[in-house]
Protein backbone atom coordinates (compact mmCIF):
# COMPACT_ATOMS: atom_id res chain seq x y z
CA UNK A 1 0.00 0.00 0.00
CA UNK A 2 2.73 2.39 0.94
CA UNK A 3 4.50 1.74 -2.36
CA UNK A 4 1.37 2.52 -4.37
CA UNK A 5 0.89 5.82 -2.57
CA UNK A 6 4.48 6.86 -3.25
CA UNK A 7 4.11 5.93 -6.92
CA UNK A 8 0.95 8.02 -7.34
CA UNK A 9 2.60 10.98 -5.58
CA UNK A 10 5.59 10.87 -7.92
CA UNK A 11 3.33 10.61 -10.94
CA UNK A 12 1.39 13.70 -9.85
CA UNK A 13 4.59 15.70 -9.37
CA UNK A 14 5.82 14.71 -12.84
CA UNK A 15 2.54 15.81 -14.43
CA UNK A 16 2.64 19.19 -12.63
CA UNK A 17 6.26 19.71 -13.70
CA UNK A 18 5.42 18.95 -17.34
CA UNK A 19 2.52 21.39 -17.24
CA UNK A 20 4.80 24.16 -15.88
CA UNK A 21 7.44 23.45 -18.54
CA UNK A 22 4.83 23.48 -21.31
CA UNK A 23 3.45 26.81 -20.04
CA UNK A 24 6.91 28.34 -19.93
CA UNK A 25 7.62 27.24 -23.51
CA UNK A 26 4.29 28.65 -24.70
CA UNK A 27 4.94 32.01 -22.97
CA UNK A 28 8.42 32.26 -24.51
CA UNK A 29 7.07 31.61 -28.03
CA UNK A 30 4.32 34.19 -27.55
CA UNK A 31 6.78 36.85 -26.39
CA UNK A 32 9.18 36.15 -29.27
CA UNK A 33 6.43 36.50 -31.91
CA UNK A 34 5.25 39.87 -30.54
CA UNK A 35 8.73 41.45 -30.29
CA UNK A 36 10.07 40.34 -33.68
CA UNK A 37 9.92 43.02 -36.49
CA UNK A 38 7.75 42.30 -39.52
CA UNK A 39 9.54 40.62 -42.37
CA UNK A 40 9.52 42.50 -45.70
CA UNK A 41 11.00 41.87 -49.06
CA UNK A 42 13.91 44.15 -48.23
CA UNK A 43 14.65 42.52 -44.87
CA UNK A 44 17.89 40.52 -44.89
CA UNK A 45 17.38 36.76 -44.59
CA UNK A 46 19.60 33.74 -44.59
CA UNK A 47 19.57 33.89 -48.38
CA UNK A 48 20.88 37.53 -48.51
CA UNK A 49 24.33 38.79 -47.62
CA UNK A 50 24.82 39.82 -44.01
CA UNK A 51 24.95 43.68 -43.86
CA UNK A 52 23.47 46.34 -41.57
CA UNK A 53 20.22 48.14 -42.31
CA UNK A 54 21.87 51.59 -42.02
CA UNK A 55 24.38 50.71 -44.70
CA UNK A 56 21.63 49.89 -47.18
CA UNK A 57 20.10 53.46 -47.09
CA UNK A 58 21.49 56.53 -48.88
CA UNK A 59 21.23 60.00 -47.23
CA UNK A 60 18.57 62.20 -48.90
CA UNK A 61 19.73 64.85 -51.39
CA UNK A 62 19.47 68.39 -49.99
CA UNK A 63 16.63 70.33 -51.63
CA UNK A 64 17.57 73.72 -53.10
CA UNK A 65 16.00 76.48 -55.14
CA UNK A 66 17.92 77.87 -58.09
CA UNK A 67 17.90 80.84 -60.44
CA UNK A 68 19.64 81.39 -63.76
CA UNK A 69 22.15 84.20 -64.14
CA UNK A 70 21.06 86.71 -66.76
CA UNK A 71 22.72 89.32 -68.94
CA UNK A 72 21.26 92.82 -68.72
CA UNK A 73 22.07 96.49 -69.21
CA UNK A 74 22.17 97.75 -65.63
CA UNK A 75 22.09 101.48 -64.79
CA UNK A 76 24.46 102.45 -62.01
CA UNK A 77 23.48 104.91 -59.29
CA UNK A 78 25.23 106.65 -56.42
CA UNK A 79 23.04 106.80 -53.33
CA UNK A 80 22.98 109.53 -50.70
CA UNK A 81 20.83 111.18 -48.05
CA UNK A 82 19.46 114.61 -48.91
CA UNK A 83 17.46 117.50 -47.53
CA UNK A 84 14.94 119.48 -49.56
CA UNK A 85 15.58 123.23 -49.78
CA UNK A 86 13.47 125.93 -51.38
CA UNK A 87 15.14 127.60 -54.36
CA UNK A 88 14.08 130.92 -52.82
CA UNK A 89 12.77 131.45 -49.31
CA UNK A 90 11.75 134.85 -47.91
CA UNK A 91 10.76 135.79 -44.39
CA UNK A 92 8.24 138.60 -44.81
CA UNK A 93 8.52 141.38 -42.21
CA UNK A 94 7.34 144.97 -42.04
CA UNK A 95 9.70 147.80 -42.97
CA UNK A 96 7.68 150.31 -40.96
CA UNK A 97 6.14 150.20 -37.52
CA UNK A 98 2.45 150.41 -36.83
CA UNK A 99 -0.67 148.43 -36.12
CA UNK A 100 -1.42 145.46 -38.39
CA UNK A 101 -4.77 146.30 -39.98
CA UNK A 102 -5.36 143.37 -42.38
CA UNK A 103 -3.97 140.15 -43.82
CA UNK A 104 -4.79 139.43 -47.46
CA UNK A 105 -3.65 135.81 -47.78
CA UNK A 106 -4.80 132.35 -46.75
CA UNK A 107 -2.34 130.06 -45.05
CA UNK A 108 -0.84 127.66 -47.59
CA UNK A 109 -1.94 129.80 -50.52
CA UNK A 110 0.08 130.15 -53.70
CA UNK A 111 0.92 133.83 -54.27
CA UNK A 112 2.60 135.74 -57.06
CA UNK A 113 5.26 138.38 -56.79
CA UNK A 114 3.64 141.75 -56.01
CA UNK A 115 0.44 140.34 -54.46
CA UNK A 116 -0.79 142.29 -51.42
CA UNK A 117 -0.17 140.30 -48.24
CA UNK A 118 -0.78 142.69 -45.32
CA UNK A 119 -1.54 146.31 -44.44
CA UNK A 120 -0.12 148.48 -41.67
CA UNK A 121 -2.17 151.46 -40.43
CA UNK A 122 -1.35 154.10 -43.11
CA UNK A 123 -2.66 157.19 -41.28
CA UNK A 124 0.61 158.20 -39.55
CA UNK A 125 2.40 158.08 -42.89
CA UNK A 126 -0.35 160.05 -44.61
CA UNK A 127 0.09 162.76 -41.97
CA UNK A 128 3.85 162.81 -42.52
CA UNK A 129 3.30 163.15 -46.25
CA UNK A 130 0.92 166.07 -45.74
CA UNK A 131 3.41 167.80 -43.44
CA UNK A 132 6.20 167.38 -45.98
CA UNK A 133 4.03 168.84 -48.72
CA UNK A 134 3.09 171.80 -46.51
CA UNK A 135 6.71 172.50 -45.70
CA UNK A 136 7.52 172.41 -49.40
CA UNK A 137 4.82 175.00 -50.16
CA UNK A 138 6.14 177.25 -47.39
CA UNK A 139 9.72 177.05 -48.59
CA UNK A 140 8.66 177.62 -52.18
CA UNK A 141 6.99 180.89 -51.12
CA UNK A 142 10.11 181.91 -49.20
CA UNK A 143 12.24 181.18 -52.25
CA UNK A 144 9.99 183.25 -54.51
CA UNK A 145 10.23 186.24 -52.16
CA UNK A 146 14.01 185.85 -51.86
CA UNK A 147 14.37 185.87 -55.62
CA UNK A 148 12.31 189.09 -55.91
CA UNK A 149 14.50 190.76 -53.29
CA UNK A 150 17.62 189.59 -55.11
CA UNK A 151 16.36 191.15 -58.34
CA UNK A 152 15.79 194.50 -56.56
CA UNK A 153 19.23 194.35 -54.95
CA UNK A 154 20.83 193.75 -58.31
CA UNK A 155 19.18 196.90 -59.75
CA UNK A 156 20.15 198.99 -56.74
CA UNK A 157 23.70 197.70 -56.82
CA UNK A 158 24.11 199.18 -60.27
CA UNK A 159 23.38 202.64 -58.86
CA UNK A 160 25.46 201.91 -55.77
CA UNK A 161 22.43 202.29 -53.48
CA UNK A 162 23.23 198.92 -51.79
CA UNK A 163 26.57 197.50 -50.93
CA UNK A 164 28.10 194.45 -52.54
CA UNK A 165 27.86 192.61 -49.22
CA UNK A 166 24.11 193.10 -49.04
CA UNK A 167 23.80 191.81 -52.59
CA UNK A 168 25.86 188.74 -51.76
CA UNK A 169 23.80 188.04 -48.62
CA UNK A 170 20.59 188.12 -50.62
CA UNK A 171 22.03 185.77 -53.24
CA UNK A 172 23.03 183.33 -50.47
CA UNK A 173 19.53 183.53 -49.03
CA UNK A 174 18.11 182.49 -52.40
CA UNK A 175 20.43 179.47 -52.56
CA UNK A 176 19.50 178.56 -49.00
CA UNK A 177 15.83 178.60 -49.93
CA UNK A 178 16.54 176.46 -52.99
CA UNK A 179 18.31 173.91 -50.75
CA UNK A 180 15.29 173.87 -48.45
CA UNK A 181 13.12 173.06 -51.44
CA UNK A 182 15.34 170.06 -52.26
CA UNK A 183 15.09 168.86 -48.64
CA UNK A 184 11.33 169.21 -48.71
CA UNK A 185 11.05 167.20 -51.91
CA UNK A 186 13.19 164.44 -50.38
CA UNK A 187 10.96 164.46 -47.30
CA UNK A 188 7.91 164.07 -49.52
CA UNK A 189 9.53 161.15 -51.34
CA UNK A 190 10.39 159.51 -48.02
CA UNK A 191 6.87 160.00 -46.70
CA UNK A 192 5.44 158.51 -49.87
CA UNK A 193 7.85 155.56 -49.56
CA UNK A 194 6.84 154.96 -45.93
CA UNK A 195 3.22 155.06 -46.98
CA UNK A 196 4.01 152.51 -49.69
CA UNK A 197 5.70 150.27 -47.11
CA UNK A 198 2.48 150.20 -45.11
CA UNK A 199 1.17 147.87 -47.82
CA UNK A 200 3.28 144.69 -47.65
CA UNK A 201 3.50 142.75 -50.93
CA UNK A 202 4.99 139.38 -51.86
CA UNK A 203 8.65 139.77 -52.85
CA UNK A 204 8.66 136.42 -54.71
CA UNK A 205 6.18 133.93 -56.11
CA UNK A 206 5.64 130.87 -53.96
CA UNK A 207 3.57 129.27 -51.24
CA UNK A 208 2.90 131.12 -47.99
CA UNK A 209 3.16 129.25 -44.72
CA UNK A 210 1.32 129.74 -41.46
CA UNK A 211 0.82 133.32 -40.30
CA UNK A 212 3.15 134.40 -37.49
CA UNK A 213 1.18 137.42 -36.25
CA UNK A 214 -2.49 138.28 -35.94
CA UNK A 215 -4.38 141.35 -37.07
CA UNK A 216 -4.41 144.11 -34.45
CA UNK A 217 -0.89 143.60 -33.14
CA UNK A 218 1.62 146.45 -33.15
CA UNK A 219 4.58 145.65 -35.37
CA UNK A 220 7.99 147.26 -35.14
CA UNK A 221 9.89 148.08 -38.29
CA UNK A 222 12.39 145.36 -39.16
CA UNK A 223 10.98 143.19 -36.38
CA UNK A 224 12.50 139.76 -35.87
CA UNK A 225 8.97 138.35 -35.69
CA UNK A 226 7.93 137.58 -39.27
CA UNK A 227 4.46 138.02 -40.67
CA UNK A 228 4.75 134.92 -42.86
CA UNK A 229 7.36 132.86 -44.74
CA UNK A 230 7.16 132.35 -48.52
CA UNK A 231 8.89 129.37 -50.11
CA UNK A 232 9.27 128.85 -53.83
CA UNK A 233 7.95 125.31 -54.31
CA UNK A 234 8.44 124.80 -58.04
CA UNK A 235 11.19 123.96 -58.62
CA UNK A 236 12.87 122.87 -55.39
CA UNK A 237 16.44 121.86 -54.61
CA UNK A 238 17.82 118.89 -52.72
CA UNK A 239 21.20 119.19 -51.02
CA UNK A 240 23.15 115.97 -50.49
CA UNK A 241 26.72 114.81 -49.96
CA UNK A 242 28.86 112.09 -51.54
CA UNK A 243 32.18 110.60 -50.41
CA UNK A 244 35.13 112.22 -52.11
CA UNK A 245 36.06 108.91 -53.77
CA UNK A 246 32.81 109.10 -55.76
CA UNK A 247 33.64 112.54 -57.15
CA UNK A 248 35.64 111.15 -60.07
CA UNK A 249 32.61 109.15 -61.25
CA UNK A 250 30.43 112.27 -61.12
CA UNK A 251 32.96 114.39 -63.03
CA UNK A 252 33.35 111.73 -65.73
CA UNK A 253 29.59 111.28 -66.06
CA UNK A 254 28.98 115.06 -66.31
CA UNK A 255 31.32 115.27 -69.29
CA UNK A 256 28.85 113.13 -71.23
CA UNK A 257 25.72 114.57 -69.61
CA UNK A 258 25.95 117.83 -67.62
CA UNK A 259 22.44 117.31 -66.21
CA UNK A 260 22.65 113.83 -64.74
CA UNK A 261 19.27 112.32 -63.82
CA UNK A 262 18.47 112.24 -60.11
CA UNK A 263 15.64 110.39 -58.35
CA UNK A 264 14.27 111.36 -54.94
CA UNK A 265 12.70 108.63 -52.81
CA UNK A 266 10.91 108.75 -49.47
CA UNK A 267 12.47 108.14 -46.05
CA UNK A 268 11.91 104.37 -46.38
CA UNK A 269 13.63 104.34 -49.79
CA UNK A 270 10.58 102.72 -51.42
CA UNK A 271 8.31 105.38 -52.96
CA UNK A 272 9.59 107.62 -55.77
CA UNK A 273 8.71 111.23 -55.00
CA UNK A 274 10.20 113.19 -57.90
CA UNK A 275 12.66 113.09 -60.79
CA UNK A 276 15.13 115.86 -61.44
CA UNK A 277 18.68 116.56 -62.54
CA UNK A 278 22.02 117.41 -60.98
CA UNK A 279 22.23 121.20 -60.78
CA UNK A 280 25.62 122.00 -59.26
CA UNK A 281 28.64 120.62 -57.40
CA UNK A 282 30.41 122.48 -54.61
CA UNK A 283 33.92 123.84 -55.21
CA UNK A 284 35.57 122.21 -52.19
CA UNK A 285 35.63 119.00 -50.15
CA UNK A 286 34.80 119.10 -46.46
CA UNK A 287 38.07 118.08 -44.82
CA UNK A 288 36.29 117.03 -41.62
CA UNK A 289 33.90 114.53 -43.20
CA UNK A 290 35.69 113.78 -46.48
CA UNK A 291 32.53 114.54 -48.46
CA UNK A 292 31.46 117.01 -51.12
CA UNK A 293 28.12 118.80 -51.38
CA UNK A 294 25.92 118.54 -54.46
CA UNK A 295 22.63 120.13 -55.41
CA UNK A 296 19.87 118.59 -57.51
CA UNK A 297 16.86 120.50 -58.85
CA UNK A 298 13.39 119.00 -59.14
CA UNK A 299 10.42 120.45 -61.03
CA UNK A 300 7.27 119.49 -59.16
CA UNK A 301 3.83 120.40 -60.34
CA UNK A 302 2.27 118.14 -57.70
CA UNK A 303 4.32 119.51 -54.77
CA UNK A 304 5.57 116.16 -53.48
CA UNK A 305 8.70 117.68 -51.91
CA UNK A 306 8.67 120.14 -49.02
CA UNK A 307 11.51 122.26 -47.62
CA UNK A 308 13.53 120.51 -44.87
CA UNK A 309 12.09 117.12 -45.90
CA UNK A 310 14.45 114.14 -45.59
CA UNK A 311 14.80 112.10 -48.80
CA UNK A 312 16.96 109.36 -50.30
CA UNK A 313 18.81 110.33 -53.48
CA UNK A 314 19.84 108.12 -56.41
CA UNK A 315 22.24 109.84 -58.82
CA UNK A 316 22.68 108.13 -62.19
CA UNK A 317 26.30 107.94 -63.37
CA UNK A 318 26.55 105.22 -66.05
CA UNK A 319 25.11 101.99 -67.48
CA UNK A 320 26.86 98.61 -67.39
CA UNK A 321 26.09 96.97 -70.72
CA UNK A 322 25.51 93.20 -70.91
CA UNK A 323 26.33 92.72 -67.25
CA UNK A 324 25.86 89.35 -65.53
CA UNK A 325 23.08 89.65 -62.95
CA UNK A 326 21.93 87.23 -60.24
CA UNK A 327 19.36 87.49 -57.45
CA UNK A 328 20.60 89.02 -54.24
CA UNK A 329 19.84 85.78 -52.35
CA UNK A 330 22.39 83.85 -54.43
CA UNK A 331 25.39 85.87 -53.27
CA UNK A 332 27.22 84.39 -50.28
CA UNK A 333 30.07 85.73 -48.16
CA UNK A 334 32.89 83.60 -46.77
CA UNK A 335 36.36 84.01 -45.32
CA UNK A 336 37.81 84.34 -48.82
CA UNK A 337 35.20 86.82 -50.06
CA UNK A 338 32.05 86.58 -52.13
CA UNK A 339 31.01 83.30 -53.74
CA UNK A 340 28.01 81.50 -55.22
CA UNK A 341 26.93 77.87 -55.39
CA UNK A 342 26.66 76.77 -59.03
CA UNK A 343 24.59 73.75 -60.10
CA UNK A 344 25.88 71.79 -63.12
CA UNK A 345 23.99 69.58 -65.58
CA UNK A 346 24.18 66.59 -63.20
CA UNK A 347 22.68 68.67 -60.38
CA UNK A 348 25.98 68.74 -58.53
CA UNK A 349 27.01 71.92 -56.74
CA UNK A 350 30.35 73.65 -56.65
CA UNK A 351 31.52 76.80 -54.90
CA UNK A 352 32.53 79.59 -57.28
CA UNK A 353 34.33 82.76 -56.18
CA UNK A 354 32.99 85.97 -57.77
CA UNK A 355 33.70 89.69 -57.76
CA UNK A 356 30.80 92.08 -57.25
CA UNK A 357 30.45 95.22 -59.36
CA UNK A 358 27.37 96.60 -57.60
CA UNK A 359 24.48 95.44 -55.48
CA UNK A 360 21.04 96.64 -54.47
CA UNK A 361 18.12 95.16 -52.57
CA UNK A 362 17.11 92.88 -55.47
CA UNK A 363 20.02 92.21 -57.80
CA UNK A 364 23.76 91.72 -57.78
CA UNK A 365 25.92 92.67 -60.75
CA UNK A 366 28.85 90.28 -61.09
CA UNK A 367 32.09 91.77 -62.37
CA UNK A 368 33.91 88.45 -62.87
CA UNK A 369 33.77 84.78 -61.94
CA UNK A 370 30.34 83.92 -63.34
CA UNK A 371 28.86 83.72 -66.82
CA UNK A 372 25.33 84.19 -68.05
CA UNK A 373 22.88 81.25 -68.11
CA UNK A 374 24.46 79.47 -65.14
CA UNK A 375 22.25 78.07 -62.40
CA UNK A 376 22.97 79.43 -58.93
CA UNK A 377 21.47 78.34 -55.62
CA UNK A 378 19.19 80.91 -54.01
CA UNK A 379 17.81 78.85 -51.10
CA UNK A 380 19.15 75.87 -49.15
CA UNK A 381 22.83 76.88 -49.15
CA UNK A 382 23.35 75.93 -45.49
CA UNK A 383 23.26 72.18 -46.27
CA UNK A 384 25.58 72.21 -49.28
CA UNK A 385 29.03 70.67 -49.64
CA UNK A 386 31.43 70.74 -52.54
CA UNK A 387 30.41 68.23 -55.24
CA UNK A 388 27.20 67.18 -53.50
CA UNK A 389 24.21 66.24 -55.60
CA UNK A 390 21.10 68.28 -54.90
CA UNK A 391 17.41 68.08 -55.53
CA UNK A 392 16.04 71.16 -57.28
CA UNK A 393 12.65 72.17 -55.97
CA UNK A 394 10.24 74.82 -57.16
CA UNK A 395 9.03 77.34 -54.59
CA UNK A 396 5.37 77.08 -53.77
CA UNK A 397 3.25 79.81 -55.30
CA UNK A 398 1.41 81.89 -52.69
CA UNK A 399 -2.22 80.96 -52.34
CA UNK A 400 -4.66 83.44 -53.82
CA UNK A 401 -6.71 85.18 -51.18
CA UNK A 402 -10.43 84.52 -51.44
CA UNK A 403 -12.71 87.44 -50.90
CA UNK A 404 -15.84 87.06 -48.87
CA UNK A 405 -18.61 88.32 -51.21
CA UNK A 406 -20.52 89.80 -48.31
CA UNK A 407 -17.49 91.70 -47.02
CA UNK A 408 -16.61 92.90 -50.53
CA UNK A 409 -20.12 94.18 -51.02
CA UNK A 410 -19.96 96.12 -47.76
CA UNK A 411 -16.63 97.55 -48.68
UniProtKB/Swiss-Prot annotation:
* Topological category with respect to the lipid bilayer: Peripheral membrane protein
GO cellular component terms listed in the entry, alphabetical order = efflux pump complex; plasma membrane
* Coiled-coil blocks: none
Places the protein is found: Cell inner membrane
UniProt keyword Membrane present: yes
Q: How does it assemble?
A: Part of a tripartite efflux system composed of MdtA, MdtB and MdtC.
In Swiss-Prot or TrEMBL terms, this protein is called: Multidrug resistance protein MdtA
Source organism: Proteus mirabilis (strain HI4320)
